[in-house]
Amino acid sequence: PLAAHATVIAVHQSAPLGLGHAVWTAAPHTGNQDFAVLLPDNILVGPDPAIGALLRVHDKTGGAVAGLERVPAARTAHYGVCEGTWHGDRLQVARVIEKPPPGTTDSRHVFVGRYVLPPRIHPLLAQTRPGRHGELQLSDALAELASERALTGVQLAARRLDTGTPLGLLEATLVLGLSRPDSADGVRALIARYHQS
């Protein structure tokens, strides 16, 4: 069971003021320790648990680590994008651009909602000015770490399923249902039934 390996604490974010605000709100619980952030609307399916891959890199570098995915150029405007220098599957991040307009970056590597962060992120968030819609963006604090060469990106060997939309949630349910021996036949039968109607 999870309880044997981790302490899970729910922290209420008083208003939707951005991912940076959510991370900053958790500061009293993370204290002076490194911690992981996993966005629940992104499910990563692959041979190696994504957070484990990030922790292995963190153990070697001691710095902040972010999971990355390569997306089509037309999709970069929807994500935080990283630029930098590649060393194998690791990117020494030099620049972070939050949702760049099309054509403003050559990079197609975006954050996928998995991070290992140092406690230093909290004071960076505290001094970050809110952006659009009054939201505090984690990417602004990550950009500061990148400017200090203290952020590593890792190209994850995983498929990302975005459950943030109704169609994305349906796709994730189908992909996961079809991948399990105990549910695959039932999911196929459901698809066939609704496909015929």
What are these regions (language model features)?
Residues 187-197:
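Intrinsic disorder at enzyme termini
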Residues 36, 55-59, 86-189:
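Catalytic-core segments of class I nucleotidyltransferases/pyrophosphorylases
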Residues 1-86, 119, 125-128:
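Conserved beta-loop-beta/alpha segment of the NTase-like Rossmann-fold superfamily
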